[in-house]
């Protein structure tokens, strides 16, 4: 058990240095000039993790409360990826009270190299908060391979979502040029026309070479059908969490 724990710690904070297929130093400085995706980052991650099974990998999730639940879609996605790749995986959840991560939680085991999953989902916070705390959300000794961005509900509804994420995206590309970025188009909010804020989001991200996982389209938009899938006006209920899990895992070509 001690050996396993040590392996998981290594997986949480360390990853190999590699050249990502869709990121480079130029993109870090001028993200709007990125070329369209040739292969989705999620599939590239899975293929690379299979091809180099002994090498550790690191995933980072930055976002709001929709990804923060300890029994929600994010850890479920982690467990499914761990099982598919036969890699041990551990995660830490961000705490907005301490502005730091909590204790490590194991998500799976396996004989191959470990995967660390930093869940920087911060309830009630926006992309600017992630930018301000980036040096703690992605510790100095971590080298992320895949960074998922899950923002929308806490952003300014009067400003295009893609525009609001630009400062964070630019900083991520500057600091982590070898990491692939993935943006999640969040599920609808009850009583709000979130479609207006996210209009053009997918095309804007695609133009920058950032894959979009479309959770929004997996949900109904009318309030009556949406209500059972939310535990409040925004955050998914257990049934909604399952839709999130299934949709995100499809992007990795992993069964829920």
PLM-predicted stretches and their roles:
Residues 1-61, 66-72, 82-99, 249-256:
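N-terminal secretory targeting modules
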Residues 40-48, 101-105, 127-139, 162-171, ...:
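Alpha-helical scaffolding within the catalytic cores
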Residues 54-62, 66-158:
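Conserved SGNH/GDSL esterase-like catalytic core that processes O-acyl groups on lipids
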Residues 69-71, 127, 155-161, 190-196, ...:
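Extracytoplasmic/secreted cell-surface and envelope-processing proteins
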Residues 75, 79, 132, 163-170, ...:
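Solvent-exposed, polar/charged alpha-helical surfaces in well-ordered, non-transmembrane soluble domains
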Residues 78-86, 135, 139-142, 152, ...:
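Sec-exported extracytoplasmic/periplasmic mature domains
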Residues 148-154, 165-200:
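Active-site segments of SGNH/GDSL-like serine hydrolases
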Residues 187-256:
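Catalytic His-Asp segment of secreted/periplasmic serine-dependent ester chemistry enzymes
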């Amino acid at each position: 058990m001690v050996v396993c724990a040590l392996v998981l710690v290594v997986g949480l904070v360390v990853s190999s240095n590699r050249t990502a297929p869709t990121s480079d130093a130029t993109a870090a400085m001028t993200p709007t000039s990125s070329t369209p995706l040739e292969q989705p980052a999620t599939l590239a991650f899975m293929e690379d993790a299979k091809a180099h099974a002994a090498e550790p990998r690191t995933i980072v999730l930055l976002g709001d409360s929709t990804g923060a639940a300890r029994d929600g879609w994010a850890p479920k996605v982690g467990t499914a990826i761990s099982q598919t790749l036969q890699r041990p995986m551990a995660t830490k959840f961000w705490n907005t009270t301490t502005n730091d991560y909590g204790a490590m939680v194991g998500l799976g085991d396996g004989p191959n190299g470990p995967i660390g999953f930093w869940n920087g989902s911060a309830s009630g916070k926006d992309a600017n908060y992630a930018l301000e705390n980036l040096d703690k959300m992605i510790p100095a000794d971590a080298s992320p391979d895949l960074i998922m961005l899950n923002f929308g509900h806490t952003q300014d509804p009067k400003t295009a979502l893609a525009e609001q994420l630009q400062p964070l995206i630019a900083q991520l590309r500057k600091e982590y040029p070898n990491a692939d970025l993935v943006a999640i188009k969040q599920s609808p909010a009850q009583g709000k026309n979130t479609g207006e804020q996210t209009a053009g989001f997918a095309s804007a991200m695609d133009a920058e070479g950032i894959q979009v996982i479309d959770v929004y389209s997996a949900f109904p938009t009318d309030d009556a059908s949406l209500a059972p899938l939310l535990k409040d006006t925004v955050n998914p209920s257990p049934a909604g969490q399952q839709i999130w899990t299934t949709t995100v895992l499809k992007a990795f070509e992993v069964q829920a």
